[in-house]
């Protein structure tokens, strides 16, 4: 990732707004993680190959999937893309627009934290499924119903152990239920 002015502005705003919430930056990327035990809330300030600037993507990454990469498994709405592209024109303009994206990301992080409670997660998943019928993410949501099954817990613990071994993820929280 180029360390250009747009990236520096994003990082500073995230440092001011997201990091105090306990969200951490994955390495030096534009990816920010909120560790919620069985899932990460993933906030991405996605660059474009065509112009300096950013999109905002936010979604959950479920740890029972045992992936060795961060994926966007479950969005707040129908898509992971929360906000369209802001093109960098100058520092003042970009900071003024990006702060709204960082504030939106912080609101979604706080919302998703409510899903740490399994009853809340199940209720939300049911409402989400009714709203977005025939969505391919139905299997992800059905797994919430089996969150305390031994096999699901084993997968979560194994995946958390994998991510904890990565230097870029050393700020993960500890959870008695989900850590080895």
Language-model-detected regions and their locations in the chain:
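Intrinsically disordered, low-complexity regulatory regions enriched in serine/threonine/proline
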Residues: 1-6, 32-180
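Amphipathic alpha-helical segments
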Residues: 3-25
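A short acidic/basic microdomain associated with nuclease active sites
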Residues: 22-34
